[in-house]
């Protein structure tokens, strides 16, 4: 079969150009399909943009559900005797605090030992056991030692290996002492402070080692035995608004509730002059410190601002996707129209979201966004009234919580989060359903394009055959005509 470029060579007719025009006309059958593909792909992109904006609002709504974590408190300035912090249970208030005593961990010291590797137990005993008992521990520490494990080093390592409530260390008194000689001492220190960590030590199965380590506590901060108490166990003592408080540790977690006090030092005293029997006398008085706990509205305010910003971004996305640009009568639709103009899914999401946001909540004083301090502008976006919002956060935090989270019985406006979650569900959500339908339509269009191309190719092949035969026929007629003309001359 002749190529397109050679068509008409025999007849002198411009059949190649005619065939090109026929092919261009056939290709126009693809244009409606291509336009539909472009439109549906734009819709997919539009739904992707919409999903991104909805995800941001969903994330911001999820943060508002964590009201208790956001509804925080803060404390005033620096304090000499304690470092304060608060959790979600703290309530605003003023507290007068005096630190009377810091909690301390007990520390015991052995008698002098010559050399840290010298075996201190009776040989031939096989195994002996060091038992350390503390009132606050469920089980006593039991350290078993063999005959060759009774040096200070071995005892220290064996105790520390147990990882109980006791630390063991060695103090070398002689600067030039060796491991075999030189004054050394074993130090046992409770890891925890307070009187419930007072140690009682007993060595079973080795009287010689017992002469070095045995210690019996009297339960009152003292004791007797081979070891000497260098630091007595003590509980933390303080007063809060004049109420005496005693704890095992310097971290006071429940007085007042929701406030953590890390005690640093005992309160200083000052001399004040008072009248006693008509005479001025100087008496010592502790310098108390005032802890002021106030509500910290900034985290919640920031979360609300992020939520409003996310909503406004979504509103901008809605406007962009549904944009309509008028055209003259008979003109084609503008290319500037939104990708989801007239789309029912977009309208449905926008309508449901608006209903959720602006429906009145069952909260006495703060039933609407406007009463909360968030108003809707003419363009549909939201605007925060800082003064009104801050006043509500400071004075009506429970109502703000009920507005966003509900009161435990009735839902708050974070039901918007549930709507967004359903909308964005990857399997059955509104957007997933819409995009699934678009993808199915695109696959159908792809098959239609392939079939149309096959039909066009078949049609063009038929035209080529017909044009080739026509070229041959005209060429033959031309040759016959030329021969007859020569005969008739």
UniProtKB/Swiss-Prot annotation:
It is found in: Secreted; Bacterial flagellum. Pfam families: Flagellin_IN (PF07196), FliD_C (PF07195), FliD_N (PF02465). Residues 70-81 have a biased composition (Basic and acidic residues). Residues 82-91 have a biased composition (Polar residues). Disulfide bonds: none annotated. InterPro entries: Flagellin_hook_IN_motif, FliD, FliD_C, FliD_N. GO terms for biological process: bacterial-type flagellum-dependent cell motility; cell adhesion. Its main location: secreted. Residues 430-480 form a coiled coil. GO terms for cellular component: bacterial-type flagellum filament cap; bacterial-type flagellum hook; extracellular region. The keyword Coiled coil applies. Keywords: Bacterial flagellum, Coiled coil, Secreted. Residues 70-92 are annotated as: Disordered. NCBIfam families: PRK08032.1. Homopentamer. Required for the morphogenesis and for the elongation of the flagellar filament by facilitating polymerization of the flagellin monomers at the tip of growing filament. Forms a capping structure, which prevents flagellin subunits (transported through the central channel of the flagellum) from leaking out without polymerization at the distal end. Belongs to the FliD family. This is Flagellar hook-associated protein 2.
């Amino acid at each position: 079969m002749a190529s397109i470029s050679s068509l008409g060579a025999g007849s002198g007719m411009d059949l190649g150009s005619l065939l090109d025009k026929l092919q261009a006309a056939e290709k126009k059958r693809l244009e409606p399909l291509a336009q539909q593909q472009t439109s549906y792909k734009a819709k997919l992109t539009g739904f992707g943009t919409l999903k991104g904006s909805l995800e941001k609002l969903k994330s911001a709504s999820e943060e508002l559900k964590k009201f208790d974590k956001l509804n925080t408190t803060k404390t005033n300035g620096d304090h000499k005797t304690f470092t304060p912090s608060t959790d979600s249970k703290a309530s605003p208030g003023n507290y007068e605090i005096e630190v009377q005593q810091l909690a301390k961990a007990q520390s015991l010291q052995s008698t002098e030992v010559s050399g840290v590797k010298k075996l201190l137990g009776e040989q031939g005993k096989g195994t002996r056991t060091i038992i350390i008992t503390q009132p606050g521990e469920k089980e006593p520490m039991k350290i078993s030692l063999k005959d060759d494990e009774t040096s200070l080093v071995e005892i220290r390592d064996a105790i520390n290996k147990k990882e109980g409530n006791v630390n063991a260390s060695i103090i070398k008194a002689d600067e030039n002492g060796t491991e075999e000689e030189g004054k050394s001492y074993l130090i046992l220190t409770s890891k925890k402070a307070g009187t419930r960590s007072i140690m009682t030590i007993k060595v079973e199965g080795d009287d010689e080692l017992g002469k070095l380590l045995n210690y019996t506590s009297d339960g009152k901060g003292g004791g007797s035995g081979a070891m000497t108490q260098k630091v007595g166990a003590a509980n933390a003592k303080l007063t809060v608004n004049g109420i005496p408080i005693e704890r095992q540790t310097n971290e006071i977690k429940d007085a007042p509730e929701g406030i953590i006090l890390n005690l640093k030092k005992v309160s200083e005293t000052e001399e004040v002059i008072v009248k006693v029997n008509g005479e001025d006398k100087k008496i010592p008085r502790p310098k108390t410190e005032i802890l002021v706990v106030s509500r910290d509205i900034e985290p919640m305010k920031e979360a609300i601002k992020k939520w409003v910003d996310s909503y406004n971004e979504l509103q901008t996305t809605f406007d962009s996707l549904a944009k309509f640009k008028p055209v003259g009568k008979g003109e084609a639709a503008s290319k500037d129209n939104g990708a989801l103009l007239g789309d029912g899914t977009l309208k449905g999401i926008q309508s449901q979201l608006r209903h959720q946001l602006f429906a009145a909540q069952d909260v006495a004083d703060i039933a609407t966004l406007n009463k909360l301090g968030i108003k809707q502008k003419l363009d549909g976006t939201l605007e925060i009234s800082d003064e009104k919002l801050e006043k509500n956060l400071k004075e009506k935090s429970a109502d703000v919580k009920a507005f966003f989270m509900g009161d435990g019985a009735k839902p708050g406006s974070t039901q918007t989060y549930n709507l967004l979650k359903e909308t964005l569900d990857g399997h059955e959500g509104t957007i997933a359903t819409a995009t699934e339908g678009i993808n199915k339509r695109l696959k159908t269009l792809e098959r239609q394009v392939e079939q149309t191309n096959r039909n066009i190719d078949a049609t063009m092949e038929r035209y080529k055959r017909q044009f080739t035969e026509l070229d041959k026929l005209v060429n033959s007629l031309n040759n016959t005509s030329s021969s007859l003309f020569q005969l008739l001359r």
